[in-house]
């Protein structure tokens, strides 16, 4: 989805988005219950848990990598169970989470200006992607404005469990509804 601004070779060499510190487990991708059964069949050793902070209203799940950490160091990273370090992501395209397809973009719920105001969603840029930091921000905004931003928000409206809370970390907004 972002191949016009991110080179697949850069992503394949980096794999930052496929490793998780304990403090970034909120970033692990979300799978539907329907996909979970297919994943368990294809990857019998992969472990899953209910997705946190989304109420599990849509029976959403993520992978459980807690047993991959070898130390108490909060900066230690554990890899996605579907990452082959030499081949990249091993998930079939139809099972690859939308979160992964749009990385380093995230859907955030913007803060309300008043209690009576409805929630508004926006597309934010995750600042930790080394490759996207080399791309001019306006180029990212232009891509989002070309239809990708609305496509992402439409998907989020149908899958609210993928929406993250707005924060200082996710404060670079690249798209909101016009």
Predicted regions and their residues:
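Short loop/turn segments that flank or connect secondary-structure elements
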Residues: 1-178
